[in-house]
From Swiss-Prot:
Disease as annotated in the protein's UniProt record: Ciliary dyskinesia, primary, 10: A disorder characterized by abnormalities of motile cilia. Respiratory infections leading to chronic inflammation and bronchiectasis are recurrent, due to defects in the respiratory cilia; reduced fertility is often observed in male patients due to abnormalities of sperm tails. Half of the patients exhibit randomization of left-right body asymmetry and situs inversus, due to dysfunction of monocilia at the embryonic node. Primary ciliary dyskinesia associated with situs inversus is referred to as Kartagener syndrome.
Subunit details: Interacts with CFAP300. Interacts with DNAAF4. Interacts with DNAAF6/PIH1D3. Interacts with DNAI2 and HSPA1A.
Modified residues (Phosphoserine): 461, 467, 640-641, 773
Organism annotation: Homo sapiens
Protein name: Protein kintoun
Sequence ranges of Basic and acidic residues compositional bias: 428-442, 484-498
Compositionally biased tracts (Low complexity): 445-459
Pro residues bias: start-end ranges: 233-242
Length: 837
């Protein structure tokens, strides 16, 4: 900065390379340096200065202008700051050539002021001069010249001195267009700052005709160059309106806020979860304090969203609202004495880590889908093998971007997120939507028994989250016919939730590409909360900032925007007791997403239970935040009466492993005491993390049998954490998990492979002990009330392999081992490998 200021005065020289070379070689010559020193001495010689002034006065008199050189006599010096960036000094001087001060009595009644005297203070100004200070710093010096009587009065009366200093500062501001810090102006002990330079007063002589009258044509020779215009005769000055007396207030220093990001190459990988965050890592605040000598004179206080700076001498006051919440415990401040700058570095409190998607796109990464069993890619593959003709025509006409396996074609039924879609109409029969389904028919997924092919651009659709295989979720489907069709003779029922990038519902249910053109789409949204704010993450790339149209109400928030020729809109509503603050939301937009921060009303601070989300207020669905209340409610429903009716159990053992803001881990063990050969324990592990995207399945095997001794009721509760729909998974070590990943295949192929795998480890007697049936119960939602959609599944099963037969290869003896426990450092993709241990 100092180098730039030093070189600014040399930029107007405009020297060529040859001239620079000549000057360099000349100053290396000792004879040239001696002559140059003599020339400088002649310029500073007082006798030569007087001769120069006399010659200039004679030349100006010939032009009809009287010139007087005003030599400033030292008085006192005012120190202040110039434009809040660097130091400045104002020399209050005196000279007899300036007019003497005068006063006249005034009542002050017309201005509302007290009676007193109105003073007239003539002054003379000289252009500012720049000097080099210590540590290569630069400062400006201005000279304001008054009559000696004015300075004499100022030395005797303190009030008159304050008026004189205020007049000098105001004159410099008006004449040179700069901003001086009047509040922190301080009088120094020095009488003059810098080298005195004479100012010039030019007044026209009365009755003198100019050298060439107006209207006379110019001669053949050009006029002699003259740097000043001919002064005009002073006219009567109009009285200026009185200025209102301003109360002295502390000076607000200049500052700059820089957002600092750390470059991480992981954010630039070719992956769906790699994207630079719009939230910076640090905030660097640079505060200009040109009059502050040390950091001891200032008091700095930083809170979560506010920076406060106070100083008495000099008088500074700054209240800066920070754009992001910061960690005040890990911030640092440093004062640069050379530049008189206070640099404050504050680390930003990063939001909860973004959940990494656990769903692979079948079209984009087929090799990943082939390696993992039970993924969306296999569900789509099996669905395409068993698709029907009417379903293909519906997919082509409607353009839905979903892929659902049919129950009739493959023996696998894919349920909607809370409910099953109604069966399709028969061939040649047109389906008429019901009144309750008319508005949301275009958002529903494929019914059981039909398959819809994804559109070619379904992988990169903004609404679908980049997943071509999506489950449908709607509040309109609720017919009993759909439930009856889902309870056929299928051996396996699979419940899928494809969450895409953000764990949201399908593209059709969220208003994806399957919607009609011209209608707004519902964007994928993540929601996180703390006690005072709500943070919304809109996962739509390339949002146009000028298209944002928001409407904020204490009970709801509505936003409409556009991106890539698509229009998006969503409606966010909360419970009546949960209210938002009406302050303006903080919006940050990047190339990949947008972050919106909403403040909670002071009377509603704390953790909220649920929130309602949809494209408008007519199609809202309830979502739950992860908190202790919601988890306790889920455990009460899991441990309700169906367990007691089906099995004779001891009191359940519940162990809370970990409870944090981002993770809740509970271990509940249900034991049976009646039969030791049957199921000894059932462990449920609830692992709900707000920063991971999980896709969970409940898959069971069904083999014909007549014996059923026990039943276990399992409920899947959907709880939203940071806007994600996640299911509590019922993990059991029974035989139902032996066919994990094969439920998407056709029924005939699945049964043959299952029998082949089972014959390697099971006897014929153990095969007859396998029995499992799935009964799906659904809750209907009231049209006037928004409630959570809970999918309840009752599983009747018989304990599988609770003993191991070990054959000695030497003597052929067989040893039966019961209650075998094996600890493994990793989890198997297929539970059959665990049973073969």
């Amino acid at each position: 900065m100092a180098k730039a200021a030093a070189s600014s005065s040399l930029e107007d020289l405009d020297l060529s390379g040859e001239e620079v070379q000549r000057l360099t070689s000349a100053f290396q010559d000792p004879e040239f340096r001696r002559m140059f020193s003599q020339y400088a001495e002649e310029l500073t010689d007082p006798e030569n200065r007087r001769r120069y002034e006399a010659e200039i006065t004679a030349l100006e008199r010939e032009r009809g202008v009287e010139v007087r050189f005003v030599h400033p006599e030292p008085g006192h010096v005012l120190r202040t700051s110039l434009d809040g960036a660097r130091r400045c000094f104002v020399n209050v001087c005196s000279n007899a050539l300036v007019g003497a001060p005068s006063s006249r009595p005034g009542s002050g009644g017309d201005r509302g002021a007290a009676p007193g005297s109105h003073w007239s203070l003539p002054y003379s100004l000289a252009p500012g001069r720049e000097y080099a200070g210590r540590s290569s710093s630069r400062y400006m010096v201005y000279d304001v010249v008054f009559h000696p009587d004015a300075l004499a009065l100022a030395r005797r009366h303190e009030g008159f001195r304050q008026m004189l200093d205020a007049t000098a500062l105001e004159a410099v501001e008006k004449q040179f267009g700069v901003k001086l810090d009047r509040r922190n102006a301080k009088t120094l002990k020095a009488k003059y700052k810098g080298t005195p330079e004479a100012a010039v007063l030019r007044t026209p002589l009365p009755g003198v005709i100019p050298a060439r009258p107006d209207g006379e044509p110019k001669g053949p020779l050009p006029d002699f160059p003259y740097p000043y215009q001919y002064p005009a005769a002073p006219g009567p000055r109009a009285p200026s309106p009185p200025e209102a007396a301003l109360q002295p207030a502390p000076t607000e220093p200049r500052y700059s806020v820089v957002q600092r990001h750390h470059v991480d190459l992981q954010d630039y990988r070719c992956s769906r979860d790699s994207a630079p965050s719009p939230v910076p890592h640090e905030l660097v605040i640079t505060i200009e304090l040109p009059l502050l000598r040390s950091a001891e004179q200032a008091a700095l206080e930083v809170t979560r969203k506010l920076l406060c700076l106070d100083s008495r001498k000099p008088d500074y006051r700054l209240r800066l609202s920070l754009p992001y919440p910061v960690d005040d415990g890990r911030g640092k401040a440093q004062f640069n004495k050379a530049r008189r700058q206070l640099v404050v570095t504050l680390p930003v409190v990063l939001p909860a880590a973004r959940r990494e998607p656990a769903v692979a796109v079948a079209a984009a990464a087929p090799e990943e889908s082939a390696d993992r069993s039970g993924t969306d890619g296999q569900a789509c593959a099996s669905a395409r093998e068993g698709e029907a003709g009417p379903a293909r025509s519906r997919a082509e006409d409607g353009g839905h971007d979903t892929c659902v396996a049919g129950a009739a074609g493959s023996g696998v039924t894919t349920l909607g997120d809370p409910e099953v879609a109604p069966p399709p109409a028969a061939a040649g029969e047109e389906r008429v939507p019901k009144p309750g389904e008319q508005d949301l028919s275009r958002h529903a997924g494929s019914p059981p028994g039909s398959v819809e092919e994804p559109s070619p651009g379904g992988e990169n659709s903004p609404g679908g989250g980049g997943s071509p295989c999506l489950s449908s979720r709607s509040l309109a489907w609720g017919s009993s016919a759909g439930r009856e069709s889902a309870r056929g003779d299928s051996s396996v029922e699979t419940r899928e939730e494809s969450e895409g990038t953000g764990g949201q519902r399908s593209a059709c249910a969220m208003g994806g590409p399957g919607t009609k053109s011209g209608e707004p789409l519902c964007p994928p949204l993540l929601c996180n909360q703390d006690k005072e704010t709500l943070t919304l993450l809109i996962q739509v790339p390339r949002i146009q900032p000028q298209s944002l149209q928001g409407d904020l109400n204490p009970l709801w928030y509505k936003l409409r925007f556009s991106a890539q020729d698509l229009v998006y809109s969503f409606f966010l509503q909360f419970a009546p007791e949960n209210k938002l603050s009406t302050t303006e939301p903080v919006i940050s937009i990047s190339s990949n997403n947008a972050v919106i921060e909403l403040a909670k009303s002071p009377e509603s601070h704390g953790h909220w239970r649920e929130w309602y989300y949809g494209v408008n207020n007519d199609s809202l669905e309830e979502r739950l935040f992860v908190n202790e209340e919601n988890v306790n409610e889920f455990l009460e429903e899991v441990l309700s009466s169906p367990f007691k009716q089906s099995m004779s159990l001891t009191p359940p053992l519940i162990e809370v492993l970990q409870v944090t803001d981002n993770k809740i881990q509970i271990n509940a063990k249900l034991q049976e005491c009646s039969n030791s050969d049957q199921l000894q324990g059932k462990e449920e592990r609830v692992n709900e993390e707000s920063h991971l995207t999980e896709k969970e399945y409940i898959e069971h095997c069904n083999t014909p049998t007549t014996d059923s001794d026990s039943s276990i009721a399992v409920k899947a509760l959907q709880i939203d954490s940071f806007g994600l729909v996640t299911c509590f998974q019922q993990e059991s070590l029974d035989v139902s998990q032996m066919i994990l990943g094969k439920s998407q295949q056709p029924e005939s192929k699945m049964q043959s492979e299952f029998i082949k795998e089972k014959s390697a480890t099971c006897s014929n007697e153990e095969k007859d002990n396998l029995n499992e049936s799935v009964i799906t119960e659904e809750k209907e939602t009231d049209g006037d009330h928004l409630s959570s959609l809970l999918n309840k599944t009752t599983v009747h099963n018989i304990p599988g392999f609770d003993s191991i037969k070990e054959t000695n290869m030497q003597d052929g003896s067989v040893q039966v081992i019961k209650d075998h426990v094996t600890n493994c450092a990793f989890s198997f993709q297929n539970s059959l490998l665990y049973d073969l241990d």
